């Protein structure tokens, strides 16, 4: 059922590059101390806090930004390559592009599971560096999946209602 909804999913992820740039700007402003989003970026706080000091190898401003750029670059590059292969498949007589995209997506899933967990530690859990959870990344991932399926369904229902997805039926949307 998903090929009919590929363009919907690709459209939804179209925000990734501008959204990623926005996130990087916020994180750079945090590192420059132009906001106080992450308390562990304040040297005075770190000096008097044993827990934050113990995490200073991981909670390092430069390493933090490098990780953020790594996560977002990987996600944006995957989105770009996957979309390019998807469009190429539309104009192809064989399924080589589909097979490439399938293999790429399987590899990306592993990359995403790891980087999404680390992203949740970096951007959410480190707001309060005294709190930690080994399961938090999985909770965030589960929330992302539910949000993604809901968003795909709502946008697909809307697009079908205005005539853009005539081949989509209740079987595709599990209604």
Q: What are these model-predicted stretches?
A:
Residues 55-175:
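Long, contiguous internal "core" modules enriched in hydrophobic/ aromatic residues
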Residues 1-91, 108:
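Transmembrane-helix bundle segments that line or gate the permeation/cavity pathway
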């Amino acid at each position: 059922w998903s090929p009919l909804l590929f363009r919907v999913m690709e459209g939804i992820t179209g925000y990734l590059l501008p959204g990623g740039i926005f996130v990087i700007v916020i994180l750079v402003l945090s590192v420059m101390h132009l906001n106080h989003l992450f308390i562990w970026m304040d040297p005075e706080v770190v000096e008097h806090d044993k827990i934050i000091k113990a995490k200073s190898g991981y909670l390092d401003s430069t390493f933090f930004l490098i990780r953020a750029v790594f996560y977002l670059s990987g996600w944006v590059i995957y989105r770009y390559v996957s979309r390019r292969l998807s469009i190429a498949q539309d104009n192809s007589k064989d399924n080589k592009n589909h097979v490439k995209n399938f293999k790429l997506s399987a590899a990306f899933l592993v990359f995403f599971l790891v980087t999404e967990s680390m992203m949740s530690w970096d951007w959410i859990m480190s707001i309060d560096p005294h709190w930690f959870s080994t399961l938090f990344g999985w909770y965030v991932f589960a929330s992302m999946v539910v949000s993604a399926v809901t968003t795909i369904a709502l946008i697909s229902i809307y697009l079908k209602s205005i005539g853009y997805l005539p081949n989509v039926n209740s079987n595709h949307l599990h209604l």
